[in-house]
């Protein structure tokens, strides 16, 4: 998921993506705590995807405020 793809989405779609990513991050942290996580790098990619979505949402909010 790159920033350009995210910028083409509506704010509602971005919020849905954000909820989905946060749920996935929670599940990955839970798996890590119980020792069931096999792909540790997935935590980092999900966390960065959350940051990307939040950045684009903030850009859209700032753009709408102007």
Swiss-Prot record:
Biological processes annotated in GO: translation
GO cellular component assignments: cytosolic large ribosomal subunit
Superkingdom, taxonomy of origin: Bacteria
Record carries keyword Ribosomal protein: yes
InterPro entries the record matches: Ribosomal_protein_uL29, Ribosomal_uL29, Ribosomal_uL29_CS, Ribosomal_uL29_sf
Keyword Ribonucleoprotein: yes
Family from the record: Belongs to the universal ribosomal protein uL29 family.
Protein name: Large ribosomal subunit protein uL29
Annotated source species: Ruegeria pomeroyi (strain ATCC 700808 / DSM 15171 / DSS-3)
């Amino acid at each position: 998921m790159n920033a350009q793809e995210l910028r083409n989405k509506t704010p509602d779609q971005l919020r849905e993506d954000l909820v989905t990513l946060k749920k996935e991050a929670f599940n990955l942290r839970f798996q890590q705590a119980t020792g069931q996580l096999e792909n540790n790098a997935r935590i980092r990619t999900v966390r960065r995807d959350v940051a990307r979505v939040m950045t684009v949402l903030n850009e859209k909010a700032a753009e709408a405020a102007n």
